[in-house]
Amino acid sequence: MRFNRIFLLLLCVTLCFCGCQKTNTLPHVNDTKETGLLDELIFLGDSTTAHMQQRAAVAPSQIWATRNRYYNLDSRVTYTKILLPETGEELTVAEAAARKKPPFLIITLGIDYGVYYYRNDLDKFRLYYEKLLDVIKEASPDTVLVLQSIFPVARESATITNEMIDRANEVIAAIAEERGLIYVDASTPLKDNAGYLKPSYCSSSDGIHLTAAAYDAVLKNLACYEQRIKEKGS
């Protein structure tokens, strides 16, 4: 009888320990066999996109970013090289698009350089943005391009303002409309009532970079456009 009580006690302890271990283990984004649209998306962008590799529920192979994580929207936008996640090769975006032929490419670009430096010359902002779109389309005509708005900044941002970002986003939205592309407003869901990036969504003292919770909000917002994105790809 005493032996049975000891055995049951040990069994309970073992089960509790295993249960705790299981609860603390987070599943990887690709652990499930069933995959939805999210698994087909490639995200291209500057530092706010690069940080998705560590903070968003997507596979690292879905992120196209530069080695130093900065991707300037300037005269060299088509020459800048990104790291191809699968091989570690450095390729231009056009070269990567020609090789991988991604079905869907989500572009979020402008915060690292364009928004501030072309704040008084949005025609130049548009010029470089469209140059990038042109080379991608030439390299991979069947890739569905989705233009996502630049994310807002928090109060801590010293140089870039949300007014600058809003004006740049108006340009991006206009480009999308003129080209028949999908424009995703990711800015509004991230803003507080005063128009700043919500404090809980800001991970850096510069007021620019996002937390894991912010990326969750970005992906949930993107899911609202899923039907339209799928229709473009059909």
Predicted regions and their residues:
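Active-site segments of SGNH/GDSL-like serine hydrolases
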Residues: T108-D112, I136-D166
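Catalytic His-Asp segment of secreted/periplasmic serine-dependent ester chemistry enzymes
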Residues: P152-S234
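A structural signal for isolated positions on well-ordered beta-strands in alpha/beta enzyme cores
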Residues: I42, I106, V144-V146, I182
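Extracellular/periplasmic envelope-modification machinery, especially enzymes
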Residues: G19-V29, A56, P60-L73, T80, ...
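Conserved SGNH/GDSL esterase-like catalytic core that processes O-acyl groups on lipids
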Residues: E34-L127
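N-terminal secretory targeting modules
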Residues: M1-L44, T48-Q54, I229-S234
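Generic structural signal for well-ordered alpha-helices
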Residues: Y129-D134, N169
